[in-house]
């Protein structure tokens, strides 16, 4: 029997570690509390649900390939030029388009050490090298990022706020990064968690896009209840938006996602409610965990990062196992280089009370 020939991918592809999302099921457990994927705690706006039901009869129609109505709604909401907005199937797709359009073999991208994993995955996918700049106290270090830049660097990705650490830089530091880069390097400010930031010295990136060359802002609808519909958007200079429109697919966003996005933007009160809920329970959870002796830093996202002991009975793996026994799934972040941490999404009131109760029992040594 002739041995099957296995086609080989391009060099570097097999070096990619596949992205593993937050789990949603546990064997033998019926009631799951999923706090592993940073989804919106309150779900989607009622207007979104109504709009999806109303649009169900149009599922056989191709969507508007230019997302015209959604871009116009985004422009009205944020005071931006719709012509300089491009929408994608989540901001993930837009990260991939930027890498595909501007990087390739022999090139490099720069990101902070604990930045979003997809930057490196997409870079390797096009043959570019991801360079990780060291962080300071789990926070992007602008000096380290600038020092990591090479002649080959085409893109610099900054998640602000960052996932999974929750740390956030003031606008002045982001400006310092942009001004320290060569003009031909594209700075991508990934503001996926912008809705949850509560500080006066923060801008999601739109002003930087307008005031400095070759800067792109990424945003998403995933954190305000539309994660399952995969919808994100970017704002940038006209020449970069033109390039992204040339490399994206013709119908890259489904019609239901477009309708849902417009409905979400039309209900700012629900976004405000989601933000208030997140703020209350994020700080409540942080205080409760700190009182138990668990280290939890400040977070500007819809999650907290809990740090456990490196060894002994109170490790992150042991805490995770204890939570899973109660049907609670949080996010292990060893893949980010943080093996002693768990990322805990802010969920509903009862869910946060359950995770705090379970961790309290764990830290008290119950069940051991």
From Swiss-Prot:
Enumerate the Gene Ontology biological process terms.
L-histidine biosynthetic process
The gene name on file is: hisC
Known EC number(s)? 2.6.1.9
Q: What is this protein called?
A: Histidinol-phosphate aminotransferase
Q: State the similarity comment.
A: Belongs to the class-II pyridoxal-phosphate-dependent aminotransferase family. Histidinol-phosphate aminotransferase subfamily.
Pathway membership, UniProt: Amino-acid biosynthesis; L-histidine biosynthesis; L-histidine from 5-phospho-alpha-D-ribose 1-diphosphate: step 7/9
Superkingdom, natural source: Bacteria
Pfam families in alphabetical order? Aminotran_1_2
Keyword field: Amino-acid biosynthesis, Aminotransferase, Histidine biosynthesis, Pyridoxal phosphate, Transferase
**Which cofactors are named for this entry?**
pyridoxal 5'-phosphate
N6-(pyridoxal phosphate)lysine: which positions carry it? 223
Q: How does it assemble?
A: Homodimer.
Which residue ranges does UniProt annotate as crossing the membrane?
none
| Alphabetized InterPro entries for the sequence | Aminotransferase_I/II_large, HisP_aminotrans, HistidinolP_aminotransfase, PyrdxlP-dep_Trfase, PyrdxlP-dep_Trfase_major, PyrdxlP-dep_Trfase_small
Organism for this UniProt entry: Rhodospirillum rubrum (strain ATCC 11170 / ATH 1.1.1 / DSM 467 / LMG 4362 / NCIMB 8255 / S1)
| Molecular functions per Gene Ontology | histidinol-phosphate transaminase activity; pyridoxal phosphate binding
